[in-house]
Every structure is written in structure tokens, then in C-alpha cells.
UniProtKB/Swiss-Prot annotation:
GO terms for biological process: response to fructose; response to glucose; response to sucrose. Disruption phenotype: No visible phenotype. Drm1 and drmh1 double mutants have no visible phenotype. This is Dormancy-associated protein 1. Belongs to the DRM1/ARP family. The keyword Phosphoprotein applies. The modification Phosphothreonine is found at T64. Transmembrane segments: none annotated. Predicted to be an intrinsically disordered protein.
Length: 132
């Protein structure tokens, strides 16, 4: 038993100190005897332990638990492929594309009229789109 205690001290607590603190290493305590305390005094100490649990109210029929839902997010692809369907940006599209910022700047409709005009206005369309 002594060998086991020494091994325990060496592994867990480390090696014994050279001097001084060796006696503080192991603390032995005696359990308190309640009967000894009660005998010396005129009143007896009585201890009770009790455990109570509240009654659970169960529903009449079992129900399937519902999963919490997250709020619906806007579909990004819907707003990309159908620009007019996004209610938050519906007015922005008409303001940007239908009303040019400069009197001589081409609109979107000027860029796609026909093949001949498209070739003439390619540079203007690119510059106009780049500025916006």
C-alpha cells in the first residue's frame, strides 16, 4: 500500500520536495460523526432528505414536433433573371435604363435597334454602360 501511495504521489503530485513541505502533501481528514455532536447537547439533530418532482402535464394525444422555420429570403436568381419581379428594385431599373443621365447618352434601346446602328453605337453603348 505504501508503494502504491508513493507511486501515486510521484506520478500525480511530482517528486517529494527536498525539505519542508513533505508533511503538507497528504491531508487525512476524519469524517464528522453527527451522533457525537447530538450527545453533548440537549437537542437532537435530525436530518431528513427528500426529493420531489413536479407532476408533468401530458397532452391527451401525442403530436409530431414541428421544426422551426427561418424567414423566407429573397431568391437571388429570380431577381437576376427577372429584374422586374423584385419589388424592392422594380422602380430602380426603369429609372436607370429608360431615363438617360446625359441628354446625348444612348439608352438600352439605342444599343439594340438594328445591326448597322449597333455597330455605330457599340463604343457609345460600352462607354454609357461603363459610366453607370
Amino acid at each position: 500500500m505504501v508503494l502504491l501511495e508513493k507511486l501515486w504521489d510521484d506520478v500525480v503530485a511530482g517528486p517529494q520536495p527536498d525539505r519542508g513541505l513533505g508533511r503538507l502533501r497528504k491531508i487525512t481528514t476524519q469524517p464528522i460523526n453527527i451522533r457525537d455532536i447530538g450527545e453533548g447537547s440537549s437537542s437532537k439533530v435530525v436530518m431528513h432528505r427528500s426529493l420531489t418532482m413536479p407532476a408533468a402535464v401530458s397532452p391527451g394525444t401525442p403530436t409530431t414536433p414541428t421544426t422551426p422555420t427561418t424567414p423566407r429570403k429573397d431568391n437571388v436568381w429570380r431577381s437576376v433573371f427577372n429584374p422586374g419581379s423584385n419589388l424592392a428594385t422594380r422602380a430602380i431599373g426603369s429609372n436607370i435604363f429608360d431615363k438617360p443621365t446625359h441628354p446625348n447618352s444612348p439608352s438600352v434601346y439605342d444599343c439594340v435597334d438594328n445591326e448597322a446602328q449597333r455597330k455605330e453605337h457599340v463604343a457609345l453603348c460600352l462607354v454609357g454602360a461603363w459610366i453607370k
